[in-house]
């Protein structure tokens, strides 16, 4: 049997199904303005060895099924000789490390990008006291804090992936920022990953708005009657 007739090492039917799930969700995020100029990348676990991921350089608001490709967990293209995102390793490292993780979303909204620049020197953004912290899996109260790591940007994905792995060795997180770049968020399925992504977006926007208010006037606590 030659290479042209060799069976695919993954389910084509499952890929077809996941491609439509990815495209529908990515289009919504693109229409929200979170994927400008063909940026951002998105993936979904296909099986125990493969992931479906967006092809590099495609307009995320106009994706079709051919814009979703397959990679193995080393980030190598499988099935079709297409070029995956340069950041594919940041997706596949999560699938290798956490068998329960099935979806990884990476976006470039203005809020995410500005927050990543503003807090770059702090290495982390601490979100505390918000009711919406309960949107993150495992949180059941607002009386807690969630830390969002901020990594320095680099074009060397091996270096960045190693930094992310070192962080995950020490703590559990549902996402992180890359300086001047954007946000990564993930979950056990698309719905959970979207919830985490949207919660990060909302909470980061709240933090930015608070900074603006504190810069223009002193916030005076209202006494309880």
Curated annotation (Swiss-Prot):
Keywords: Amino-acid biosynthesis, Lyase, Metal-binding, Methionine biosynthesis, Zinc
Reaction catalysis annotation: 5-(methylsulfanyl)-D-ribulose 1-phosphate = 5-methylsulfanyl-2,3-dioxopentyl phosphate + H2O
Matching InterPro entries: Aldolase_II/adducin_N, Aldolase_II/adducin_N_sf, MethylthioRu-1-P_deHdtase_MtnB
Gene Ontology cellular component terms for the protein in this record: cytoplasm
Single Gene Ontology MF annotation: methylthioribulose 1-phosphate dehydratase activity
Group of enzyme by EC: lyase
GO-annotated biological processes: L-methionine salvage from methylthioadenosine; monosaccharide metabolic process
EC number: 4.2.1.109
Signal peptide start and end residues: none
Pathway(s) where this gene product acts: Amino-acid biosynthesis; L-methionine biosynthesis via salvage pathway; L-methionine from S-methyl-5-thio-alpha-D-ribose 1-phosphate: step 2/6
Known function: Catalyzes the dehydration of methylthioribulose-1-phosphate (MTRu-1-P) into 2,3-diketo-5-methylthiopentyl-1-phosphate (DK-MTP-1-P).
Family: Belongs to the aldolase class II family. MtnB subfamily.
Name used for this protein in its record: Methylthioribulose-1-phosphate dehydratase
Organism whose genome encodes this protein: Xanthomonas oryzae pv. oryzae (strain KACC10331 / KXO85)
Gene: mtnB
């Amino acid at each position: 049997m030659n290479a042209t007739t060799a069976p695919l090492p993954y389910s084509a039917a499952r890929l077809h199904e996941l491609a439509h799930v990815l495209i529908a969700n990515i289009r919504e995020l693109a229409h929200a303005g979170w994927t400008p100029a063909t940026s951002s990348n998105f993936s979904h676990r296909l099986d125990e060895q493969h992931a479906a991921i967006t092809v590099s350089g495609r307009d995320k608001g106009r994706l079709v099924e051919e814009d979703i490709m397959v990679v193995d967990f080393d980030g190598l293209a499988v099935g079709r000789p297409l070029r995956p995102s340069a950041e594919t390793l940041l997706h596949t490292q999560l699938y290798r490390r956490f068998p329960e993780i099935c979806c990884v979303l990476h976006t470039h909204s203005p809020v995410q990008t500005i927050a990543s620049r503003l807090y770059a020197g702090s290495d982390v953004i601490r979100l505390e006291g918000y009711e919406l912290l309960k949107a993150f899996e495992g949180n059941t109260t607002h009386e807690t804090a969630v830390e969002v790591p901020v990594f320095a940007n680099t074009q060397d994905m091996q270096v960045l992936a190693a930094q992310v792995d070192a962080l995950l060795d020490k703590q559990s997180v549902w996402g992180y920022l890359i300086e001047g770049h954007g946000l990564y968020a993930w979950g056990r399925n698309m719905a959970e990953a979207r919830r985490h992504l949207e919660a990060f977006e909302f909470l980061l926007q709240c933090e930015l708005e608070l900074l603006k208010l504190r810069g223009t006037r002193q916030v005076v606590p209202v006494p309880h009657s």
